[in-house]
UniProtKB/Swiss-Prot annotation:
It comes from Bacillus subtilis (strain 168). It comes from the Bacteria. This is Uncharacterized HTH-type transcriptional regulator YqaF. The gene is yqaF. InterPro entries: Cro/C1-type_HTH, Lambda_DNA-bd_dom_sf. Residues 6-60 form the HTH cro/C1-type domain. One of its GO terms (molecular function) is DNA binding. Residues 17-36 bind DNA. Disulfide bonds: none annotated. SUPFAM superfamilies: lambda repressor-like DNA-binding domains.
Amino acid sequence: MMRKWLKKNRLEKGFTQEEVAKAAQIGRAYYTMIENGTRKPSVIVSKKIGEKLGFDWTIFFEDVCNETKHNSKDSA
């Protein structure tokens, strides 16, 4: 499942995929796979992405990491 919330968050903060990938110490292609939902990041990578983009990294490991739940936090 594509993580549209992740892309939206990155774009709102004004970062490129390359910048986030560099902060997470991974390649841009791997970050793209995380953003597209084809790869799940490790705990270490999740923490670095969360730190760079300013969100709780544990969202990557929730049973249902869906956009409705994430977006409900934005609209509250």
